[in-house]
Amino acid sequence: MKKILSILIAFSLINTANAVTRITCIGASITYGATLPDPATQSYPAQLQKLLGEKYSVSNFGVSSATLLRKGDLSYWNTKAYQQALQSKPDVVFVDLGGNDAKLINRVHLGEYEKDYHDLIQSFAQLPSHPRIVLLLPIPSFQADTNHIYDKTIVNSIIPKLRNVAYNEHLEVIDMHSMFVNHESWMPDKIHPNLEGTAMTAKRLYDIIVQPHDKTFDVFSRMNQQFKETDFYGYPCAGFTFDNRDCKVVKPKWAAKGHPWVWRARFWGHEPQTDIALLEHGFHIVYCDVAELLGNNEAIGYWDDFYKMLTNAGLGKKAVLEGMSRGGIYLYNWAAVNPNKVACTYADNALLDLKYWPDSAILKKDFNLTYAGQIGSLKVSPIDKVGQIVKGNFPMLHLSADDDEAVDPSKNTLLFEQKVKELGGSITVIHKPGFKHHPHSLPNPAPIVEFILKATGYAIPFPN
């Protein structure tokens, strides 16, 4: 009996060691690899297989021209590939459907898009393998013909509906649209990626598969706050009052190890593409409204309390600080007092010297001034605190619109950069030639996201 038991245990260990993670990719022509010289080896599922190696099995069930809609002109529901995908015993399912639904012939049925998507998801969720399901936003269409795949329909209808589905189904969603929006050269026919585009898609999906998760961490249950949950671009957002200030915490679908987080200093939800991208990587996004205290001691005190509450709830000890415009005042004044609690900063067309703040009444109130001109002598601006800031040894990223009419770069970002470098600090400035104060950020936030991932230790290199 002992011999039989030993054999069974050994067999079990061999099977476990040889276990292969099955990844099923469903979609239309982009998944299939249409227009590529050799779809069998160059489609993004094929390239994903090469990146992941022999411990994974990636299957391509893409069907050219297929729609998510049941009533579409070529519905994925009616294809043999769909049935094969259901029978593939998947551990992970990537769903890349929605572009063809933006054709004129299919738009009449878009009212049924969410229902059809929910049903498709359930058909996989109910499989015995209970796969992880990841939804991909459609990439852009650069076609001008509104009868065909039309990008305005993708942006204004398909993507919001898809995010609603992701929120209601508690599923991950990956923003492929932003990743391609500034890379028309990757799409020679305006709708299908070339080899470079499919390679970047494969790498993005590779990152999702291999990044370590903390599946059990839930910051909402650990904050000890009464909150109202809302939908932040497909992610759960807790809104609550803390120290009589309006606060928000958005949690990712899964937390990265170490529970990293981004602290938005001001203008919640404005140009959110960086925040959304980092949520995809397992970061949390938080906000504590201290407008309009302009980074004074009262504001710093509120933020100190907020930081303590969040870190006690399990978020990492160092925050990524993000500030647009006068948000730069808030983030750097807090960083000057708390340099060892900062992982890195991202400041965008940032106001860094309160001498150039236009509202004298607020300035006098916040800093107890007789007249606004006294602000310079108080040395209460980030431009005056560079020595304290660089003590944190954290990297800083600034976006600077060269033609900014609201915040003069020469008196703010560029002077700040000079002072940081003189004191041995680490700062990178991305210039935006010809741009004014708005818009902030970048349509494709990849340079910002890559900077933050590298600074926090979450960047995933290409495998050897």
Model-derived segments and spans:
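Catalytic His-Asp segment of secreted/periplasmic serine-dependent ester chemistry enzymes
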Residues: 36, 139-214
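Active-site segments of SGNH/GDSL-like serine hydrolases
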Residues: 96-100, 123-156
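C-terminal catalytic histidine-bearing segment of alpha/beta-hydrolase fold enzymes
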Residues: 188-191, 195-203, 210, 250, ...
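The feature captures the conserved acid-bearing segment of alpha/beta-hydrolase catalytic domains
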Residues: 356-422
